[in-house]
Amino acid sequence: MSVTLHTDVGDIKIEVFCERTPKTCENFLALCASNYYNGCVFHRNIKGFMVQTGDPTGTGRGGSSIWGKKFEDEYSEYLKHNVRGVVSMANNGPNTNGSQFFITYGKQPHLDMKYTVFGKVIDGLETLDELEKLPVNEKTYRPLNDVHIKDITIHANPFAQ
C-alpha cells in the first residue's frame, strides 16, 4: 500500500504500514482520498531533522482527523525513526494525532515511542533532498517560499469502500 505526494519540487512515494498502524493509516488515507492535503504547505523544515506538513491552515496549529477529534498513538517496537524518510504523525503530546505528519531527514531515535511511525519513503529521496535544501526563516523554520502538496495519488487503498 502506498501513496505518492506530488509537490512543487517533485514526487515522494510513501509506503504506509496499514497492518501495524491501522487507525493512523485509515485516517491518513481517508484524508488523502478526500483531497484534504491538496494545497497544504510544508510549514516546518529543519535541516538534518525533518519536514512537516498536513495543516490546511498553513500555520502548524491546525488540522483534524477524519473523526473530528484527536486520536490515539499506535506504537510498535518494529517501527522506528531509524533512517532518512520515515513518515510519522506530528502531535502535541500523547494521543493527540490529527492530520499533520512529518518526514525525517535522518535517524531520530529520540522520537521513538513518542510519534506514530506509519510509513517510509520508497521513492523520491531526491525530492526530500530538495525540500531539505530550502532556505527557511531561522526563528520559525518555515520555508521562505511556500512549497505545497499539489495532490496525492493513492495506490491500492485497502480501506476504500
From Swiss-Prot:
Reactions catalysed, as given in the entry: [protein]-peptidylproline (omega=180) = [protein]-peptidylproline (omega=0)
Alphabetic keyword roster: Acetylation, Isomerase, Methylation, mRNA processing, mRNA splicing, Rotamase, Spliceosome
Alphabetical list of CDD domains matching this protein: Cyclophilin_PPIL3_like
GO molecular function term, any single one: peptidyl-prolyl cis-trans isomerase activity
Top class in the EC scheme: isomerase
Domain PPIase cyclophilin-type: 2-154
EC number: 5.2.1.8
GO BP terms in the entry: mRNA processing; protein folding; RNA splicing
Subunit structure: Identified in the spliceosome C complex.
Function: PPIases accelerate the folding of proteins. It catalyzes the cis-trans isomerization of proline imidic peptide bonds in oligopeptides. May be involved in pre-mRNA splicing.
Annotated protein name in UniProt: Peptidyl-prolyl cis-trans isomerase-like 3
Species whose genome carries this gene: Rattus norvegicus
